[in-house]
């Protein structure tokens, strides 16, 4: 038979192990979405979570101003993307718009190309692609102000805002 003090010590160790293994796994630390793939979650501010993309944007990006009619977005590895959305050009964010110019490709990868150009551009925190419906291209714009202001637009624009992955 064990002494009562040893039994208490064993109990404390077991409870501590339980807390470490099971409770901390709910708040798994991450750097990218692939760190969270085991649960189908996304990495938001360094924690795996299953919140909606729109809620993640509100948590992830300080002082973002979203038009109330914007109701959804999509997670991508480096950006949150919004369909039918543009920058509010009257806002400080919109006034940093840089017109990269027209991009045309032989397929529909022009959007990806615009996004990759933003990743290579100093201080780019957002990109916008306005598709030209009759071709495989469109206009590419970059934004540098860290306080995005977004509003609904026509059906041909796609907006991407950088994710603040730790």
Curated annotation (Swiss-Prot):
It is a single-pass membrane protein. Belongs to the asfivirus envelope protein p22 family. One of its GO terms (cellular component) is virion membrane. The keyword Calcium does not apply. It comes from the Viruses. Induction: Early structural protein. The keyword Membrane applies. This is Putative membrane protein 162. The chain crosses the membrane at residues 2-22. It is found in: Virion membrane; Host cell membrane. Residues 23-166 are virion surface.
């Amino acid at each position: 038979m064990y002494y009562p003090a040893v039994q208490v010590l064993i109990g404390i160790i077991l409870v501590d192990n339980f807390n470490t293994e099971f409770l901390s796994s709910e708040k798994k630390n991450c750097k990218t979405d692939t760190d969270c793939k085991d649960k189908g979650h996304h990495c938001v501010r360094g924690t795996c979570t299953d919140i909606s993309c729109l809620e993640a944007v509100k948590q992830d990006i300080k002082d973002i101003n979203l038009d109330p009619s914007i109701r959804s977005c999509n997670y991508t590895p480096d950006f949150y993307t919004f369909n039918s959305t543009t920058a509010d050009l009257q806002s400080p964010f919109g006034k940093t718009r840089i017109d990269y110019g027209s991009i045309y490709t032989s397929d529909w990868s022009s959007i990806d190309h615009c996004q990759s150009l933003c990743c290579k551009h100093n201080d780019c925190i957002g990109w916008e692609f306005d598709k030209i419906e009759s071709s495989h291209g469109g206009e590419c714009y970059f934004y540098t102000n860290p306080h995005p202001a977004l509003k609904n637009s026509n059906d041909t624009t796609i907006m991407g805002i950088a994710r603040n992955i730790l």
